[in-house]
Amino acid sequence: MTVTAQQGDATLEQEISAVGKESPLPALASLHDLQYFDSLQTFSYSTSPTANQAFTDFSGVEELSHLERFSMNGARPETLEPLSHLSQLKQLSLTECGTLDLTPLEGLEQLESLTLSSNDRIVSLEPVTKLPALRSLSLSSGTAVPSLEPLAQTNLAVLDLGLGVGQSGLYKEIDYSPLSQLPDLVCLNLTNHTRVTTKFCKQILAHSPDLRFLNIQNTPASEGSALDVEYLRAYTEADLLKRLANKLRNTFG
């Protein structure tokens, strides 16, 4: 179990390693005590989902009006409503958190980065269309979604949909066409998506002029020779990194 909290320039980090089967400290059960850290800017908590199934309530975090970064791994929140009060939140990571309804996140106007990797399911991606500053979204490592259609209404620069080996079935009924409607894309990860073809990749390239990183490892497109990406090779590695840095700087400020 790892807990990290940052307040201003001071960082408190606590790492607990269990020698036997039991941890020296009980698993986190409540966030209410965080109210005493009223200037907290960063909070991160990670534990095994099986060891922390009782942690289902995010209540208390709404008191952290200065919080900019919140990361939680292994919880099973019944609702994300407490997060809706974090008006300064810029980065949010919820991993291995079961099934998530993102509706309470609507209106987080400062949120730039949202990581939802390794969850069971996202009820709907519609709420991400109500996040005007969102530029980076990760749904990697087996997080199931009902549709990618809402993504066409976003201004994403970074999108990670990478799957693990054997997870391609999660997308067997998914319409990929919204991915060709993201003109601001810089980075796209489609690893292990077995329905991604060369033809579709051409559509993405045609409609995403800023795209510089496209991962199609273990897809049908990676086996074809017809995918014309010569314009991507026209830049040196240093130039690519410079362009990406400038793009992300303009995106995230």
Regions found by a protein language model. Name each.
Residues 1-60, 66-104, 110-178, 184-224, ...:
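Concave beta-strand-loop units of leucine-rich repeat
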